[in-house]
Amino acid sequence: MRLALAESNDDRALREFYAESSLHGPVDLRVERPGNFFDQYRLQSDDYSTFLLKTDKDRVVGIATIIFRKAFLKDKFETIGYCTDLRIAPSRQAIMEWTDHFTPLLEQLTHEKGCHYFFSAIARNQGRAYNALVRPRSVRRHIPRYYQLGRFEIVSVLGRLPFAPPPLRTLVIRHADAAADFEALAAYLRKKTEGRLLAYEYSAEFLKRRLETWPGLTDRNFILAEDRRGNIVGCVAPWDSAAVQTFSVHQYNGFSKTLRNTMNLLALTRMTSRLPRTGQRLNFDYLTHFHADNPDIFYSLLYEAYEHARPNKFLVYSQFIVDPTTRPPKSFAAAKVPFSLYTVLSPKTPLPDFLRMPRVRAAPDFELALL
């Protein structure tokens, strides 16, 4: 087997291989790219590399992408690599070949890109990926080392209780205007992510670029919470990724079957949204750029986003365990899928200082829509 860099004319083969595999969990999902396969990566950066693992007969048996961007690491911004979309055919040979190719690849990219640190998110219920990558059986193999940076959950907000309290009356909640609000919004995002690992370099220009590169995202997507003095104290931007990536139900497993029946029954009372049948597409919004000064403001923004989305969609966001502000409020029905964010290091790379920091640290600046 050989590792090859994907090119634009590989788009069709990539989308076909990608659609054949499923993400395993409480609900097995099929992921499809309706447009160009690479559009998902351009949401985050124009600098990315997709690699194909091919057999001697040129059949694709594995893919993975590394996206490069500037991010904050302890005391400065530097280039990081985010490893995503790892798909390997379910054969021992393909898995072994991929892990053997991965370390030389990281060392090559470190030299070419000046990128010393790589990151990746893995679902904690994906046993095959966990055993192959995070907990390999042989410690003598020359493979990358995975160090847990933080644990988080993908929270799906499926419904709201009928007597849920309203948002705080002391807040002004409104939609943003790019010309009038993006400078103040960027300043707020910088304040909320200051000193946090993987933080972006927020500016008004950064936000405007996202409007240009995220299909369907406008300044009106941004919902601002302001105090009585007009200061921004929270924000969220619901966004539908269907133009670049869709998720459909391949199979419901275990408790998720009961959950679907319950949700669909409660949908008759308009307390929840209906969950789709097998083969149907999930209809949801990511809650992007989600920050709040306290849990009450977080609740108020979630309430407003839910009002805007219902009855056709549910809402999805990431909640890091160390961040109590973003825990799903009890007034909402929510399902959770556990994940971990890892730092991926070559065996030759020494342990960085940011991994030696106290175990309880602020949550990284992580945008679930870019997972």
Which role does the model predict for each range below?
Residues 1-52, 60, 82, 158-206, ...:
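Short amphipathic alpha-helix that is part of the acyltransferase structural core
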Residues 38-52, 62, 211-223, 243, ...:
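A short helix-loop-beta-strand connector motif used in the catalytic cores of GNAT acetyltransferases and
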Residues 53, 66-68, 88, 225, ...:
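GNAT/GCN5-related N-acetyltransferase fold signature
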Residues 59-69, 82, 230-240:
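Conserved beta-strand in the GNAT
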Residues 88, 93-108, 295-308:
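Conserved acetyl-CoA-binding loop-helix of GNAT-fold acetyltransferases
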Residues 92, 101-201, 212-214, 218:
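Contiguous mid-protein beta-loop-alpha structural module that forms a pocket-lining wall or clamp
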Residues 121-169, 221, 234-371:
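Active-site/acyl-donor-binding loops of N-acyltransferases
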Residues 182-245, 307-312:
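Non-catalytic interaction/regulatory modules that flank or connect domains
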